[in-house]
Amino acid sequence: MSEETQDERWERLGGEISSFDFDKLVQNKRSNRPDLHALLLLESIFPGRDGDIIGHAEHDQIWLDFDEDDSEKLTDEQIVELSACGVFYDEDSLSMFR
């Protein structure tokens, strides 16, 4: 059996989740704003990093400075929580629409 890719993992765990699920799925809110909650959650999971958390922005999408190796370290529960904040996996990076 082949190993699940990060694209497949994010689709399996968060594919049906949207930011409309934020209030239902996120119990310990760091902010009432889903996007800010996601950024604060990522900061707590990966503490001590320097530089901006937003790596790139284009039109209505931002790419966060977290790559495939970082994504592999996330638990399934964290992926569900991030998905409820509008975070998704795209082009080997975490991303959000805004």
Task: Locate each region found by the language model.
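Phenylalanine-focused residue identity feature
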Residues: F20-F22, F46, F66, F88, ...
